[in-house]
Amino acid sequence: MKIVLATEQDIAPVKDRYLVLELDTFRIKDNIVPSWCVIDAGDIPLSEMTELDHFKTQHENLIKNYKKGDLNFVEQMLEHLRGKFGGNIDSFYMELFARLQQPKSDPWDYIITKEA
C-alpha cells in the first residue's frame, strides 16, 4: 500500500489499475489536498475479492460521514471495516478511532492543517 497526496483529478487515472481509497484531507498553506491509499489487488486476500465493492462503499460512507461530523456512524463503521482490504488500512482506522476519543471541535472541521 502507498499513501499519496493528490487531487481527485490527479488520482483518477490510478483508479483504473489499483484500489484507491480516500483517507484524510489536509490544508497545506491555502491548498486543500486529500490523501489516498493505493492498494494493489495482490495485497488483498482472494476471499475478500467478492465483497470488495461492498467494503469500498462502506469506506466511502465512513469518509463522507466523518466529513459531515457524524462520528457515531464513523465509530460503528470502523468496527465493520477493521481487517478488511487485507488489513492494509487498519492503522488509519485505529487513528480515526483515537480521534473519536478526543473532544469534537466546534464547529466541526475534518481538515488537518499542516505546515508546508
Segments (PLM) and residue ranges:
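Cytosolic regulatory/linker segments at or just downstream of nucleotide-handling modules
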Residues: 1-64, 68-73, 80-81, 85-99, ...
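Alpha-helical linker/edge segments of TPR/alpha-solenoid repeat scaffolds
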Residues: 99-116
